[in-house]
A protein has these predicted regions:
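C-terminal non-catalytic interaction/assembly regions of soluble proteins
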Residues: 2, 312-471
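N-terminal amphipathic/basic leader segments beginning at the initiator methionine
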Residues: 2-34
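Active-site glycine-rich loop that binds ribose-phosphate moieties when present
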Residues: 157-171
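A conserved active-site cap/scaffold subdomain adjacent to cofactor or substrate pockets
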Residues: 207-314
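Catalytic or ion-translocation cores adjacent to nucleophile or general acid/base/metal-coordination motifs
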Residues: 115-131, 190-231
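Flexible, glycine/charged-enriched surface loops at secondary-structure junctions
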Residues: 119-123, 223-235, 283-302, 358-373, ...
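Gly-rich Lys/Arg/Thr-decorated short loops/hinges at beta-loop-alpha junctions or inter-strand turns
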Residues: 8-15, 53-68, 87, 131-154
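N-terminal glycine-rich anion-binding loops that anchor highly charged ligand groups
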Residues: 41-59
Length: 471
C-alpha cells in the first residue's frame, strides 16, 4: 500500500504526548498517554525522547561491537503496549530511538508488528545526522580545530543535530512512524506541528512556540513533577504513578501543557517554569536547528487543575550552523566497590583505599570515594576525603576508579579490588567490579549546507526504499 500524503490543517489543536524522556525511562508510561489522546479525539502524535549525548555514545559503542545493535535497547518494551492502538487510532509515532542505527530500529518495529499480528506500518527513517564519513572529513577537521579540539583526536563517530524538516516531510508523505537518530529534542514536536499546520519554514514565531512546547515535553516527567519533587519543600503526589506530559498546540504554536487524568504528579506554573529554563543558557536566544527562540516575554498561566498555558514566545531566524557531537576513544574505565560495616568501618575502608593506591601506583591517578563519608562532594585527587578526619561511620562503601588507554592495565584494578576479600583489611564484602570502553565528547559547528537531512521508507520485507525525500 503506497504512503498516503497528509493534508495540512490550519485550525484546531494538535496533541503531542511524550512517553519517554530518556533512554531507560519507564516502559509502562505510554499507556495512559495514549488513553488520553484517544479520549480527546482529533489529530495526535506520540513522541519518545530517548537520546541524550551519553546515550548516543553508548549506542555507537554497541554498534561497533554488534552491527545489528545501536538503537534504543528497550524499543520493543516501549512500543509493545501501545503500537496496535496508535496505528488503529491514527496516532503518529515520532522518536529518536533510532540512535546510532535508525534502520535497525525500523526493522525491529516491523518485527514487533508481525509478532502482534498487525499490518506492516509505514515507517520512515530520517538520516543525514552521521557526518563521520569521508564526505565530511575535511569540514569536520576544520570545525574541530575551530573548536580548539586536540589535534590528535581520532573521531569514532560524529553526529549533527538535525531539525524538524525531514520529520515533517516524512509525515506529509504518509509515515505512521518516524524513526530518527540525532535530532534536536524539540524537533520531535516541531516536525509534527510543521506538517500538521502547514507553517512556512521561516515562520519564526510559530516555530519558536512549537520549539518551546517540545522543550517542555522532551524530558518527560521532569515537567509533571518527577525531577521537581523535593519532599517537604516541593511536594509532588503520586510519584509511583507519575503522569507523562501532553501538549495541546494550536495553529499559532501556543500550547497548553497537561497530563492524563488520574495519574500522579502535578502540572502547574512551578513545574513548567522549572522545565522551561532547563538547559537554557540565554533566554533571549535558545539556539535550535529550526529557530532561535526568545522566552524573555513568555507568560506561564495556570488555566485549570494540571493545565498550564504558555504564550508570548518569539522567534528569530535559525542559525547558519548545526551543532555536531564528536565522540572519540579515551581508553578504558575500570571501577570496583567493596563494603565495610561495624566498628572502625571507616578506618578499614580508608586502609583499603591506601592498599589499592600502592598496588596500582604505576597506572596513573586513582579516584577513591567513601560512599557515606565523601563521594559526590569528593574530588578526583581525594583531597577533600584526606582533609576529613577519620570518623565513626559504621556503614561505608569504598569505590575506586581509574581510566587507562590499555585494557589489560585497567583490568588490574578489578582484580585488585577482588583480592581485598582475603588480603584485607578485615570484614570487606559485596565486591562489584566493571570494565568498559570510554568515549569522550567534543562539540563543534558545521555549516548547515554541509549537512543533508533526508528520509526514506523502510518496507517490512527490507526491499528497496518505497519513497525518499530530502529536507
Amino acid at each position: 500500500m503506497p504512503p498516503t500524503p497528509a493534508t495540512p490543517q490550519r485550525h484546531g489543536l494538535l496533541r503531542v504526548g511524550c512517553a519517554a524522556g530518556f533512554s531507560g525511562d519507564r516502559t509502562d508510561a505510554a499507556g495512559p498517554v495514549v488513553d488520553a489522546l484517544i479520549a480527546a479525539g482529533g489529530p495526535a502524535v506520540l513522541i519518545f525522547e530517548t537520546l541524550a549525548e551519553r546515550t548516543l555514545a553508548l549506542a555507537q559503542l554497541a554498534r561497533h561491537a554488534d552491527p545489528d545493535a545501536g538503537y534504543e535497547p528497550l524499543l520493543p518494551e516501549l512500543l509493545r503496549p501501545v503500537l496496535a492502538r496508535c496505528l488503529a487510532a491514527g496516532i503518529r509515532i515520532v522518536s529518536n530511538f533510532g540512535a546510532a542505527h535508525p534502520a535497525g530500529a525500523a526493522r525491529c518495529i516491523h518485527a514487533l508488528a508481525r509478532e502482534l499480528g498487525l499490518a506492516p506500518p509505514r515507517i520512515a527513517v530520517v538520516s543525514g545526522d552521521d557526518v563521520s564519513g569521508p564526505a565530511h572529513r575535511a569540514a569536520l577537521a576544520t570545525a574541530l580545530r575551530a573548536a580548539g579540539a586536540d589535534a590528535d583526536l581520532q573521531p569514532v563517530s560524529a553526529n549533527a543535530y538535525l531539525g524538524a524538516e525531514a520529520i515533517a516531510d516524512a509525515l506529509r508523505a504518509g509515515a505512521e512512524i518516524v524513526v530518527c537518530g540525532r535530532v534536536a529534542d524539540p524537533s520531535l514536536t516541531v516536525g509534527p506541528a510543521l506538517a500538521h499546520f502547514g507553517w512556512a519554514r521561516d515562520d519564526w514565531h510559530r516555530l519558536a512556540r512549537a520549539t518551546m512546547a517540545g522543550h517542555l515535553l522532551e524530558c518527560g516527567t521532569q515537567v509533571t513533577g518527577g525531577y521537581y519533587a523535593d519532599p517537604g519543600f516541593k511536594d509532588v503526589p503520586g510519584l509511583a504513578t507519575l503522569g507523562y506530559p501532553i501538549a495541546e498546540i494550536d495553529a499559532d504554536g501556543h500550547c497548553t501543557l497537561t497530563k492524563p487524568a488520574g495519574t500522579g504528579g502535578r502540572v502547574d506554573a512551578h513545574t513548567v517554569k522549572e522545565q522551561l529554563l532547563y538547559e537554557l543558557h540565554d533566554p533571549a536566544a535558545y539556539l535550535t536547528p529550526d529557530v532561535v527562540a526568545d522566552i524573555t516575554e513568555a507568560e506561564v498561566c495556570e488555566t485549570g487543575p494540571d493545565r498550564v498555558r504558555l504564550t508570548g514566545v518569539r522567534g528569530q531566524a535559525r542559525p547558519d550552523t548545526l551543532k555536531v557531537n564528536v565522540f572519540h576513544a579515551t581508553g578504558w574505565l575500570a571501577e570496583g566497590e567493596i563494603s565495610y560495616a561495624g566498628a572502625r568501618a571507616e578506618a578499614r575502608a580508608r586502609l583499603a583505599a591506601d592498599v589499592l593506591r600502592e598496588r596500582l601506583a604505576g597506572l596513573g591517578p586513582l579516584r577513591a570515594d567513601l560512599i557515606g563519608v565523601a563521594s559526590l562532594f569528593n574530588d578526583d585527587a581525594g583531597q577533600r576525603l584526606a582533609a576529613l578526619p577519620t570518623g565513626e561511620a559504621r556503614d561505608v562503601r569504598l569505590r575506586v576508579a581509574l581510566n587507562h588507554a590499555d585494557r589489560a592495565a585497567a583490568e588490574r584494578l578489578t582484580r585488585e579490588v577482588t583480592a581485598l576479600y582475603c588480603c584485607g583489611p578485615a570484614g570487606g564484602g559485596g565486591v562489584r567490579t566493571a570494565l568498559r570502553p570510554r568515549l569522550g565528547t567534543v562539540s563543534c559547528l558545521l555549516p548547515r549546507e554541509q549537512v543533508q537531512a533526508r528520509f526514506h521508507f523502510v518496507p517490512a520485507d527490507g526491499a528497496a526504499q518505497a519513497a525518499e525525500g530530502a529536507a
